[in-house]
């Protein structure tokens, strides 16, 4: 008879851009928000710019870590977006990703933030 694996749980999946300029702000903020060891973290160029990749990680985190919250962070001056990376575009993409994730996983809490290069996390939705 197969032995069931124990449930491994963390509260959140955090998705942010890989940009080195953000790390000094992101790591302390996440730790205060979710605790030292209570989150999965994914760092992708452009963060939600590649929604399909983000969705794969959300699905995986739901399956293997029974997450309850997804935290999506885009940022000012994102080079992965290039000239398209306006504040308006980031806000749209964050809200679009939030809507799509909530449609697939209605029980998940999905939070979106825009990180300014001065370290301010602006809550979007």
Where are these regions (language model features)?
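A short beta-strand-loop structural module common to alpha/beta enzyme folds
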Residues: 37-47
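Ordered, amphipathic secondary-structure segments that act as subunit-interaction surfaces
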Residues: 73-74
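Short N-terminal binding/cap micro-motifs at the start of the first secondary-structure element
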Residues: 21-25
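Divalent-metal-activated hydrolytic enzyme cores
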Residues: 1-12, 17-20, 32, 45-54, ...
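Short Gly/aromatic-enriched secondary-structure transition segments
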Residues: 27-34
């Amino acid at each position: 008879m197969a032995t069931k694996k124990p449930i491994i749980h963390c509260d959140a999946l955090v998705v942010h851009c890989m940009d080195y300029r953000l790390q000094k702000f992101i790591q302390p903020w996440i730790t205060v928000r979710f605790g030292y060891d209570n989150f999965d973290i994914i760092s992708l160029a452009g963060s939600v710019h590649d929604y399909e990749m983000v969705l794969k990680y959300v699905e995986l985190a739901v399956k293997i870590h029974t997450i309850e919250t997804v935290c999506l962070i885009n940022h000012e001056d994102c080079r992965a977006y290039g000239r398209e990376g306006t504040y308006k575009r980031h806000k749209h993409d964050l809200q679009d990703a939030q809507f799509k994730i909530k449609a697939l996983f209605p029980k998940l809490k999905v939070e979106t933030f825009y990180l300014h290069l001065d370290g301010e996390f602006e809550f979007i939705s």
